[in-house]
Amino acid sequence: MTRPPRVDRRHWPALRDAFASLPADSRVFDWQAAFPEVMAQGGFDIVVGNPPYVRQAALGPFKPYLAARYASYHGVADLYVYFYERGLELLAPQGKLSYIVTNKWLRAGYGEPLRRLFAERAEIEEILDFGHAPIFEDADTFPCILIARHRPPEPRPEPSLVRVCPVPRDRPAELSLDNYVHEHGYPVPWSRYGAEPWSLESPEVETLMGRLRERGVPLAEFVGVKPMYGIKTGLNEAFLIDETTRAELIRQDPGCADVIKPYLRGQDIKRWAPDWQGLWMIVLKSSLNFAWPWQESGDQAEAVFARTYPSLHGHMKGMEERLRARQDQGRYWWELRSCDYYGIFDEPKIIHTDIAWYPQFAYSDGPLYFVNTCYIWPTADLFALAAMNSPVMWAYMWRHAQHGKDEALRLFNSFTTTLPIADPTPEIRREVEERAAAALELTRLTQRESGELLTWLRLELGVEKPGQRLETFADLTGEAFAAEVCKRRPKGAPRLTPRTLTELTDTHRRYATAAQARAAQRRALERRMSDLVIQAYQLTDAEIDLLWRTAPPRMPGAR
């Protein structure tokens, strides 16, 4: 960070005149010219602000300047990052800065240069984190307030403390902020805040998180593999199809059935087991990875493709212009991009989405394909699956993952590879794997029966779009289920007869009772797996009590 040079007092009038002569719409602002007396004294005593929230994508033309001018520069940093550095530059020695901005820079990779700058050039006094609280209308910004004191670039002074206070997300406007911070804030050693992601947890919780790291092995090392992205199609409309389209393509050309694979959306990846909804992906691998008949046909490749898979060629031909315009494509315009790990989609795997509202890691041992919003771990390790779905790991992920909209967690592979998984004893591993397999089977059975019920509603009563309430029918009473079915039937459909309504509620009772019993069995299995995973971490009774007392939102098996 380079502080602006001081300007000789004799030049102040000329600077003021020059600054005043700038056009009214000029974007230039020279702090030396505007405040020469202040800058001559070393800067401002206080800088307070609410910097504009301009995303990095809009900064393209300015990035070369920002890179050359700001030590806090990062290629994907938003504009407020540079306001922080500029604010520090404008402070006099021991002056204070306080901004309200998004809290994402505290943990995000793009915040590392700024965090390093604060560690080297400032002394943090307070951090107030509002999380998902709606401080600003119509803006989901995850605000935080930071108060820092500017200090010269010299070795850190003796250890000092930062006052940290997470502010309740509900009704923040009703709080007396001063009183709340005084009563609920806690001191955190300043030494915690360097270039690495900043934790705002209390010292006791941070110690617990440290125990998990000490007693765990990074997930990628534990399972011996790294996660892979799903497939980037470049044009989902061309490659992702429903059952009706698949059936027609195969009717026209039975030979294409082998290249049409089951496809999962992110919303179909449930806790323990994926819930396939009858969707499909046309997997035309790149000729760079697969020996298609047209692989080396040059100008004749499309003709060979048309002869090999006539129905697929016809399907793709209508979208040729958009397919050719893709960045993500194979050697030929109808192919998917090059990918050297297609095989893992057909093998046993743990899968999850990149956005998690709840721990929903799933296992599949059959062929399933995904797009790039999902991650695939090519492993059959059911202990790892149970650990990833466990309360203790959710507590860890909540405190270390990047948070997104509505406080969903962003499970990027750069983060999940580092999740600390405890190495279990053979006895713990065996018992956890047995229970994980049982939870998988219960989940799959419920999914199959749910599919049966929804298919019956579609064929018998015309319910084409069941919606979330019918998909979670076991949570409804018989009357509520019947009312929802009536609401979801086509407009103009005849009213249901008393006999049909009785059949409907009887069917619901039969399926719901079985689903509720399986859910209770699974909860019992999960409680035992949770206890076993905690044993693997060798947590003390006090640490276990702390884990549950400080449980984050949506903790599975919350007590």
Give the positions of each predicted feature.
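Conserved hydrophobic/aromatic beta-strand scaffold that supports enzyme active sites
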Residues: 145-147, 263, 351, 376, ...
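Signature of N6-adenine DNA methyltransferases within the class I
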Residues: 30-254, 258, 361-374, 385, ...
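Non-catalytic DNA-recognition/assembly elements of restriction-modification systems
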Residues: 191-199, 213-223, 311, 422-559
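A generic secondary-structure signal for well-formed alpha-helical elements
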Residues: 51, 55, 91, 95, ...
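Short, solvent-exposed loop/turn elements at beta->coil junctions and helix N-caps
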Residues: 130-135, 336-340, 404
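Basic, amphipathic N-terminal segments
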Residues: 1-33, 40-46, 58
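Basic, amphipathic alpha-helical recognition segments used for DNA target recognition
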Residues: 375-418, 425-428, 433, 437-442, ...
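Polyanion-binding catalytic cores of nucleic-acid enzymes and NTP/SAM-utilizing transferases
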Residues: 192-379
